[in-house]
């Protein structure tokens, strides 16, 4: 793995890199770990935090390195900005189940980011017609994976792949997909309509779209006779509220729900803080189950939202 210095990067990438570092006080290091790639995919550059102030980016596609690097830097910039995020502090007790829910949620989350990133990459010149063609070739290959799945699960999988292809590929292959995969196309169309009904640069609308797409995807799963994924109570999604709401008592906006899952940190019963307007958990509370009594609820609910958020260290965004 080779570290890339700024003098080895295109001018536009260096400028993007320096803007992020200056705006957010982070140091970003770029590494090349090139491998043979049959298709261009959006995960051929990835990043991870290295302590509080360092972010490491690793690129694996040499031919399209400028595109995948610019793409990953746009993801980093969105994550560092005022954008809602997904977290999870509970467990089903089965690692595979936990991973499946998080994988789906993260896929939807990244697709929502892609709705903004595709516009940025067209504007900065890194997403050309040639790159789009290669990206869509990869999506087409992903829609016919070399794995055995039953029909319903193949449709669930294709729906998420197609959703991302519609968003980042700007509907260019819709006609082919509708012909070849009509049911998955119908499902994906329902989801992409939610994407396109919201201004995803606005945190409140990004969160609304995220919750609504997960809801719609869950309905697709249930309609095929499978058990739902419990996105509302398994995941926490950053709340976006007004300053006025911070002064309200907790029970005016949120309710505490004794979770069907266990607190991952303690192994004990978990308690979710659920938004009353959309039923989505915003946090897993640090409560001792032995002390959660009717009297506790009565007293806890009288605290202001701001007091609870501060006491429970709950991240929030102002609408």
What name fits each language-model region?
Residues 78-115:
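Post-HEXXH active-site segment of zinc metalloproteases
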Residues 280-283, 287-316:
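A charge-rich, low-complexity, intrinsically flexible signal that marks solvent-exposed coils, linkers
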Residues 53-69:
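Short pre-active-site segment immediately N-terminal to the catalytic Zn-binding motif
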Residues 119-143:
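Short helix/loop segments within enzyme catalytic domains
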Residues 139-264, 277-294:
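Pan-zinc metallopeptidase signature
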Residues 64-84:
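Active-site recognition of the HExxH zinc-binding catalytic motif
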Residues 1-49, 62, 103-105, 124-126, ...:
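Auxiliary, metal-adjacent structural segments of Zn-dependent hydrolase domains
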Residues 67, 71, 106, 111-118, ...:
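Non-catalytic, well-ordered alpha-helical scaffold segments
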